[in-house]
Amino acid sequence: AMVRSSAKNYAGVAIVTDPEDYAPLLAEMKANAGALQLATRFGLAKKAFTHTARYDSMIANWLTGLDEGAEAKPAEAAPVPAIFPAKLQLAFDRTEILRYGENSHQSAAFYRETNPVAGSIAAYSQLQGKELSYNNIADSDAAWECVKSFDAPACVIVKHANPCGVAIDGTLLGAYEKSFKTDSTSAFGGIIAFNGEVGIDVVNAMNERKHFVEVLIAPSFTAEAKTALAGKTNLRVLVVPISRVLNTLEFKRVGGGLLVQTPDDFTAQASGLKIVTKVQPTAQQIEDLLFAERVAKFVK
């Protein structure tokens, strides 16, 4: 209430809700005998209302999604929100203005959820390289979601939002070599994601092939690997915490609306297969088909 009240009276009040504003505000006050310009106070008021709106939307989402009769449950039992509330409020923070969108004539930006799911691409930290583009982020998300679905050491190479090489092996090096051989032509200029710590052996293998990539993603990199990669100043290297947790909901914009669904978290098991052909597949063939089924869900 105090934040809203202060924002309404921005003509004579400066309300600060973002610690990032402290330094520039102090500098302006120092340059203006302790005063802030009206334009600055107006900007702070807009930021304050954005802050309270986000807070209110999170509360509204929670309360709207409560099961009927939730108030009658014991106090110690936390109510469980419904999957699809009657009204949906979304809160995102803009983190980057991108050079352009999917095409060069489109403008674009990247927004991060206020509380992103652990292990999602939005949680990335960039170790080196040029700034990410719209397509870099989209392709990186496709590669990361695919590679983190595997328990065994895995490597996924994505080009134009589709996996062109996916492999698992006893080591990340073996997985990389297999995935590269899947389509060695499309592998160039793509995105590579690993689900384990990348060592110098993997970097050396990439260098031997003169494998040019746009983005390299992994949960971590060894010190030797970081040193070897540092010379590739244009290569974008991202670190993302590994987690197999999926987004609670998936969204797709349509004209004037929003399609919402739960994520495709189904993984077929050999025990659940029904073989209807006269020729029975071998155990290896079944294993290969289960692998293909897991990868197919990430093909656009």
What residue spans do the PLM features occupy?
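Internal, active-site/partner-interface "lid" segment
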Residues: 19-73
